[in-house]
């Protein structure tokens, strides 16, 4: 059907976009793509869309462009609130949105959002700052916010009923392979709810602010603390014990990601991304090419490895870094690259490599760029008021047998370029 075909085309666009970028990291910012650099989560749905939840809108990337969703006061089908903390898709394909004031569901058929979820017993809207969703092994969807709730979805109507448990305002939720539900409770620690409903509090207030929980492929449970670093659950002693990160000390852990075999990716609050090797217990800093900011001092609030193996990092107050996994012969140069941004942001219209190995690049509305053999910036000739200035739009570049560089413009005819001055004869 039409929706299936659209999903296939979206996947192909996303795949082609990522393949063309080689291994060069790509930075998405508020300059052109994102609604906000205050990013809470990166999530991929079953159709391949990348969703970015921010403090000022919800962003969706289809492999070619971003679509931004925001609250529209006179549109009841719009996003209920611009502060979006989390996105989650259940096993039936329902895409749930957790906002500052409640829960909505996105309808891809209409590109709209449902009304906010209501309380089952009173019919009133659940007004809650939503933190997390999980789908339990028994099919129940649990939601954490000001209260802990179970969510029911029927005919695009969302209803919730409160879970009778002595935990108020739980943060991140996680269910392990043995059906224990773990609840991060910030300063208070982390709660464990067993399958027989026994509730246990782990980690005292002295162990910092617990924010993230995950489980590795071996069934080990980890929690991350903003002030006290990384902990692992000791199953025999039934308690969490700190992991010695040696020279890294007590990392301010914001986010834990265990989707990569034998490695735990740790997003920190001011120390970038750190990798903990589960087998060797060694720690290392994750490094990538980046000319825009010091990645070792960045705040990483979310990490995602997508279906193609590409790594996405939410860098708080900076944007989103995409690090492609695939290697190919193409190297990206342009304004979206974190490595080489030396040809502006306008469309490229022509190329010419001269006898000295210099690559000349003609653009639409930004003149001519010259790059060295190592693709480093050499010169930029833009249009000025000088009567012999290069044109702003260059359609064609050509070097003749005497090494003269000729320019074909859009509406200003043809000219011979002086490679030193940038003027045309």
Role assignments for model-derived ranges:
Residues 1-425:
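Carboxylate-rich, polar loop motifs that coordinate divalent cations or form catalytic acidic clusters
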């Amino acid at each position: 059907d039409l929706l299936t075909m659209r999903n296939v085309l979206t996947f192909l666009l996303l795949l082609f976009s990522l393949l063309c970028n080689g291994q060069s990291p790509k930075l998405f910012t508020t300059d052109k793509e994102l609604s906000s650099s205050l990013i809470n989560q990166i999530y991929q749905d079953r159709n391949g869309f990348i969703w970015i939840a921010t403090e000022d809108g919800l962003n969706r990337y289809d492999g070619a462009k971003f679509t931004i969703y925001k609250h529209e006061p006179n549109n009841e089908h719009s996003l209920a609130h611009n502060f979006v903390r989390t996105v989650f898709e259940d096993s039936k394909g329902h895409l749930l949105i957790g906002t500052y004031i409640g829960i909505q569901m996105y309808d891809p058929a209409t590109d709209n959002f449902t009304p906010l979820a209501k309380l089952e017993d009173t019919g009133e809207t659940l007004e809650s700052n939503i933190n997390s969703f999980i789908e339990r092994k028994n099919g129940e969807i649990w939601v954490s916010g000001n209260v802990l709730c179970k969510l029911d979805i029927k005919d695009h109507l969302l209803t919730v009923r409160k879970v009778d448990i002595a935990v108020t305002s739980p943060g991140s939720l996680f269910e392990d392979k043995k059906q224990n539900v773990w609840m991060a409770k910030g300063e208070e620690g982390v709660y464990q709810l067993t399958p027989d409903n026994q509730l246990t509090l782990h980690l005292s207030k002295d162990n910092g602010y617990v924010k993230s929980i995950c489980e590795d492929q071996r069934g080990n449970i980890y929690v991350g603390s903003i002030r006290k670093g990384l902990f692992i659950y000791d199953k025999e002693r039934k308690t969490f014990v700190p992991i010695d990160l040696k020279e890294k000390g007590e990392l301010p852990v914001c986010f834990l990601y265990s989707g990569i075999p034998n490695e735990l990716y740790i997003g920190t609050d001011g120390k970038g991304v750190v990798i903990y090797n589960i087998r060797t217990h060694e720690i290392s800093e994750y490094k990538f090419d980046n000319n825009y900011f010091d990645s070792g001092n960045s705040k990483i609030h979310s990490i995602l490895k997508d279906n193609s193996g590409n790594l996405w990092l939410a860098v708080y107050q900076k944007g989103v870094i995409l690090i492609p996994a695939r290697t190919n012969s193409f190297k990206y140069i342009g304004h979206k690259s974190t490595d080489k941004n030396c040809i502006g942001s306008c469309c490229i219209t022509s190329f010419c490599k001269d006898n000295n190995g210099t690559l000349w690049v003609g653009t639409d509305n930004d003149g001519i760029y010259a790059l060295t053999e190592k693709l480093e910036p050499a010169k930029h000739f833009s249009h000025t008021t000088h009567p012999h200035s290069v044109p702003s739009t260059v359609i064609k570049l050509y070097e003749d047998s005497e090494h003269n560089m000729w320019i074909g413009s859009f509406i200003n005819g043809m000219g011979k370029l002086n490679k030193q001055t940038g003027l045309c004869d």
